Amino acid sequence: MLSVYCLASAGLRRIERNQDAPLPEEAVWLDLLEPTPEEERLVEARLGLDIPTREEMREIESSSRLYEEEGALYLTATVVTKLDTALPENAEITFILKGTRLVTNRYVDPLPFRRFVGYSERHPQANTNAQAVLAGLIESIVNRIADVIERVGSDIDSASADIFNRQRLLADKHRRSERDFRKLLERIGQSGELIAKARESLASLARLLAFAQQSTIAMTPEVRTRLRTLSKDVVAMSDHASFLATNLNFVLDATLGMINIDQNNILKIFSVVTVFLLPPSVIGAAKVKKAPDARRGKLALIFYGLALVAILASIPWPGMPAGRPLFRF
């Protein structure tokens, strides 16, 4: 789908056009969302561009993502999308700036693009040319990633409180046994996946912004200032995301340690139960009635004496370490 936007007094305005109609001269932003081959050829012929294919957009080399060609600036970024679903993912979006027009090529519909259009309608003075539209789109993407990082930070704090909050544990003695470590591990895993995708997206945006500032394409001082500010924001967010990743690993290790402690407690319970059940089992297994020699004189006394010693040795006497028998056989 090809969406065409032009500048108006009320901000960006989408132009309704027929499928076969030529591109209007006043177009500032051409947004290609899952474009058809015909739409790609139309934009390429009108602006003299070579729009990257979906496979080319996925290439990880910087030379394939960030370059200048025939007076056009090509910028491809990895953007985290589908954050409101159970399976967030990263997708590539290409920005092409040539002259007074901006072209975006994408195969996902992330929330920052829709937010940017709404913001432009409320603040028409913020987007006066194609360069400002480019800066505005990147700002919207960065703000969305900031929301993700803040949400992950809150999730980590909540998970940490579930593990280490002593007041909560003392208020409810049964809380520890009622905690669902499976759900806790799922929350930690989801937070880890989100923070990893956010860090990947931030690294991509950092390279994009650095290349855009060093490009030979003419940009207004205002736009360059906005790009420098975004670069600083991305660096700060990357550092904070790295801190959260480290903290998340600590919470994960603590959760696994709690699981190990609970497993050991269960094993202790089984050990105590075994202490009380083993002596009767030994006596029952002896089958005294079927041992005729044991009924005769001293042999019977010796046999019953050994059984009594086994019972006494199995009892946890006061002062003995838990789980340690009196005698070792």
Q: How should each PLM-predicted stretch be described?
A:
Residues 16-19, 201, 292, 298:
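Small/flexible residues
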Residues 15-18, 52-54, 60, 69, ...:
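Surface-exposed loop/turn and secondary-structure junction residues enriched for glycine/proline
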Residues 48, 232-329:
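Hydrophobic alpha-helical transmembrane segments and their immediately adjacent juxtamembrane loops
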Residues 38-39, 68, 78-257:
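Extended amphipathic alpha-helical scaffolding segments in membrane-proximal extra-membrane regions
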Residues 44, 135, 268:
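A cross-family signal for key residues in well-ordered alpha-helices
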Residues 1-125, 150, 204-219, 311-329:
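Helix-boundary and N-terminal cytosolic regulatory elements
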